[in-house]
Amino acid sequence: MVELMFPLLLLLLPFLLYMAAPQIRKMLSSGVCTSTVQLPGKVVVVTGANTGIGKETAKELAQRGARVYLACRDVEKGELVAKEIQTTTGNQQVLVRKLDLSDTKSIRAFAKGFLAEEKHLHVLINNAGVMMCPYSKTADGFEMHIGVNHLGHFLLTHLLLEKLKESAPSRIVNVSSLAHHLGRIHFHNLQGEKFYNAGLAYCHSKLANILFTQELARRLKGSGVTTYSVHPGTVQSELVRHSSFMRWMWWLFSFFIKTPQQGAQTSLHCALTEGLEILSGNHFSDCHVAWVSAQARNETIARRLWDVSCDLLGLPID
């Protein structure tokens, strides 16, 4: 009898998962930005805004009346997204600018152009990222994950920081991941030259996002600029394009994965919700403060990572 039941259960499993999917998805996609704040006259930059979570984040901010810059590597795709957002929201102040986070020259060029163009910056959302890339280096010789996900946004934030201070109250949102729990900052192997694993490299870079957020919050205390890191949830994303295994897993569990719109909610919560200033430096998931790993709470590592990052990017260490 048992021998007959097991094959039957295997046959029924896909059907049972399908039937349970709505409730499971509801459970996994909890957390909705409930803020009603409107943004007329506000200026926002969203990196990686031509797809996925970044696109949905930019769309909602445009819907609320902000002047939104889509900072993305693929300008042609960005222009198509900008037109889509303009049509959907009726907000024509959706602009596309070239930003390649794997090239510090591109980052500096973006910042220079933005600072010449705008008098204010109220929200910076560091959303762009890479995931599970085969070993490769940025234009400046950094390992791709740490180079794009951490160092690229570290430099961009520094270049725009004075504008954020001048525009205070203002906010910085860094998109991290639950994967940071598997991350470690190996200062002796920051560029992955001694040993490399694509999955772990992603985790390390997401840990770096949280450490950067916490150290930045300490340094910005009293400036009127607040900063938050977020875990968007497990989201349908182009980031898995480098891994056939992850693409297969995403397809297998597609019933349970958040949509990009759902994944954008925590970024929006941290960008918009009033009274969040006292929680600067915290990590959020599903629009609530979330627990982080022991290493992510290590102030000594955060300070050292700050100094090492400044040294790698040629920024003054203070």
Swiss-Prot record:
Residues 22-318 are cytoplasmic. NADP(+) binds at residues 48-54. It catalyses: all-trans-retinol + NADP(+) = all-trans-retinal + NADPH + H(+); 11-cis-retinol + NADP(+) = 11-cis-retinal + NADPH + H(+); 9-cis-retinol + NADP(+) = 9-cis-retinal + NADPH + H(+); 13-cis-retinol + NADP(+) = 13-cis-retinal + NADPH + H(+). Predominantly expressed in the epithelial cells of prostate, in both basal and luminal secretory cell populations. Expressed at low levels in spleen, thymus, testis, ovary, small intestine, colon, peripherical blood leukocytes, kidney, adrenal gland and fetal liver. Not detected in prostatic fibromuscular stromal cells, endothelial cells, or infiltrating lymphocytes. SELENOF decreases the retinol dehydrogenase activity. Not glycosylated. Substrate binds at residue 177. Pathway: Cofactor metabolism; retinol metabolism. Induction: By androgens in prostate cancer cells. The modification N6-acetyllysine is found at residue 112. GO terms for molecular function: 11-cis-retinol dehydrogenase activity; aldehyde dehydrogenase (NADP+) activity; all-trans-retinol dehydrogenase (NAD+) activity; all-trans-retinol dehydrogenase (NADP+) activity; oxidoreductase activity, acting on the CH-OH group of donors, NAD or NADP as acceptor. One of its GO terms (cellular component) is photoreceptor inner segment. The chain crosses the membrane at residues 1-21. It is an enzyme of class 1 (oxidoreductase). It is linked to Retinal dystrophy, juvenile cataracts, and short stature syndrome: A disorder characterized by retinal dystrophy resulting in progressive decrease in visual acuity and difficulties with night vision in the first decade of life, development of juvenile cataracts, facial dysmorphism, psychomotor developmental delays, learning disabilities and short stature. Ophthalmological findings include salt-and-pepper retinopathy, attenuation of the arterioles, generalized rod-cone dysfunction, mottled macula at an early age, and peripapillary sparing of the retinal pigment epithelium. Belongs to the short-chain dehydrogenases/reductases (SDR) family. Interacts with SELENOF. Retinol dehydrogenase with a clear preference for NADP. Displays high activity towards 9-cis, 11-cis and all-trans-retinol, and to a lesser extent on 13-cis-retinol. Exhibits a low reductive activity towards unsaturated medium-chain aldehydes such as cis -6-nonenal and no activity toward nonanal or 4-hydroxy-nonenal. Has no dehydrogenase activity towards steroid. This is Retinol dehydrogenase 11. It comes from Homo sapiens. The gene is RDH11.
